[in-house]
UniProtKB/Swiss-Prot annotation:
<feature type="active site" description="Nucleophile">
    <location>
        <position position="170"/>
    </location>
</feature>
<keyword id="KW-0378">Hydrolase</keyword>
<dbReference type="InterPro" id="IPR003010">
    <property type="entry name" value="C-N_Hydrolase"/>
</dbReference>
<dbReference type="Pfam" id="PF00795">
    <property type="entry name" value="CN_hydrolase"/>
</dbReference>
<feature type="active site" description="Proton donor">
    <location>
        <position position="136"/>
    </location>
</feature>
<feature type="domain" description="CN hydrolase">
    <location>
        <begin position="13"/>
        <end position="288"/>
    </location>
</feature>
<feature type="active site" description="Proton acceptor">
    <location>
        <position position="53"/>
    </location>
</feature>
<dbReference type="InterPro" id="IPR036526">
    <property type="entry name" value="C-N_Hydrolase_sf"/>
</dbReference>
<protein>
    <recommendedName>
        <fullName>Aliphatic nitrilase</fullName>
        <ecNumber>3.5.5.7</ecNumber>
    </recommendedName>
</protein>
<comment type="function">
    <text>Acts on aliphatic nitriles such as acrylonitrile, crotononitrile and glutaronitrile.</text>
</comment>
<comment type="similarity">
    <text>Belongs to the carbon-nitrogen hydrolase superfamily. Nitrilase family.</text>
</comment>
<dbReference type="GO" id="GO:0018762">
    <property type="term" value="F:aliphatic nitrilase activity"/>
</dbReference>
<feature type="region of interest" description="Disordered">
    <location>
        <begin position="359"/>
        <end position="383"/>
    </location>
</feature>
<dbReference type="InterPro" id="IPR044149">
    <property type="entry name" value="Nitrilases_CHs"/>
</dbReference>
<dbReference type="InterPro" id="IPR000132">
    <property type="entry name" value="Nitrilase/CN_hydratase_CS"/>
</dbReference>
Length: 383
């Protein structure tokens, strides 16, 4: 990907990242809690706020600690009911809060599309507009019993004015090719959305806070980007819901396990961590000039690359389960983003416009129903 000539590496921005337990399996109550964090961050001068992986309506810890029959019968219907559709009435509450508080945010949520779900991050700007939406490319291990996969359109960044922001979920930070793709997009601020980590360790050290904090910090060093790690906390409500009186399950979901962090482009810690069982926000002021200093020595997708020897290929088209072949032989396969389709559907709900770029529904208007043909689109990468 070529660099953006308008991309600036000057200026400072105050940011915040969340460490907190959602109101598990209750989207409306979790959004209430999110709005509280949005208002708090804005009041303290932050221009950007990062939320954890599928914070709405919560991370499905049940998939790791019990059998499939128990998980499906006890949790899946309610989880689906409390998942969000892109731009629905519940998401519009977040949009309105962003606009009223003049703050941009990335929210991790369970996105439902028909009867399927996806591990998604929605990007909402200071005006309350949805500017991007991405899905986790490959859900991890038992997550694949709950969520579908993303595709090549899900590698993206968005310039919010104060900096170019991208994001990945959880163990996407273990994927070298995915990380390299993000580095190539000249990401300046990276949202690393995580759940709380849980006690399958020491048998599985990869799931420990230590291991996952290590790859998060490494992302900052490798990509020379600021990283905001946002994480859940396992509270008593989560533990009681998923473990009940089962001592073995409770041992797998110990209280706490929060580990929000903010790192500089050289890997330096920029904020004092909260206690693992505490809820709250971490703050830092980011100086974008520090990226230039870090990249002077190593820019893996720039001067420190060898594309004549090693290169990455990515297909950014939407590969949908059904493709319609027209009379002239063309198919419906394209790179149209899900956000673009959402805006087009907004227009159809207002009136007929030929220019689809200018119009949006007022945030206090009811959200339009999702268009049936929007089955698998995602926001495409900005070069």
């Amino acid at each position: 990907m070529s660099s953006n000539p308008e991309l600036k590496y000057t200026g400072k921005v105050k940011v915040a990242t969340v460490q907190a337990e959602p109101v598990i399996l209750d989207a409306d109550a979790t959004i209430d809690k999110a709005i509280g964090f949005i208002e708090e961050a804005a009041k303290n001068g932050a221009e950007f706020l990062a939320f954890p992986e599928v914070w709405i309506p919560g991370y499905p810890y049940w998939a790791w600690i019990g059998d499939v029959k128990w998980a499906v019968s006890d949790f899946i219907p309610k989880y689906h009911e409390n998942s969000l559709t892109l731009g629905d009435d519940r998401m519009r509450r977040l949009q309105l809060a962003a606009r009223q508080n003049n703050i941009a945010l990335v929210m991790g949520y369970s996105e439902k599309d028909g009867a399927s779900r996806y591990l998604s991050q929605v990007f909402i700007d200071q005006n309350g507009d949805i500017v991007a939406n991405r899905r986790k490319l490959k859900p991890t291990h038992v997550e694949r019993t709950i969520y579908g996969e993303g595709n090549g359109t899900d590698f993206l960044t968005h310039d919010f004015g104060f900096g170019r922001v991208g994001g990945l979920n959880c163990w996407e930070h273990f994927q070298p090719l995915s990380k390299y793709m993000m580095y190539s997009l000249n990401e300046q601020i990276h949202v690393a959305s995580w759940p709380a980590m849980f006690a399958l360790t020491p048998d599985v050290h990869q799931l420990s806070v230590e291991a996952n904090d290590t790859v998060t910090r490494s992302y900052a060093i490798e990509g020379q980007t600021f990283v905001l790690a946002s994480t859940h906390v396992i509270g008593k409500a989560t533990q009681d819901l998923f473990a009940g009186d089962d001592d073995a399950k409770r041992a797998l979901l110990p209280l706490g396990q929060g580990w929000a962090r903010i790192y500089g482009p050289d890997g330096k810690s920029l904020a004092e961590p909260l206690p693992e069982d505490a809820e709250g926000l971490l703050y830092a002021e980011l100086d974008l000039e520090q990226i230039i200093l870090a990249k002077a020595a190593a820019d893996p997708a720039g001067h420190y690359s060898r594309p004549d020897v090693l290169s990455l290929k990515i297909d950014t088209r939407n590969h949908t389960p059904v493709q319609y072949i027209t009379a002239d032989g063309r198919t419906s396969l394209n790179s149209n983003s899900r956000v673009e389709n959402y805006r087009l559907h907004q227009l159809a709900d207002i009136e007929k416009y030929e220019n689809a770029e200018a119009a949006t529904l007022p945030l206090d208007a009811p959200a339009p129903a999702p268009a049936p043909e929007q089955k698998s689109g995602r926001a495409k990468a900005e070069a």
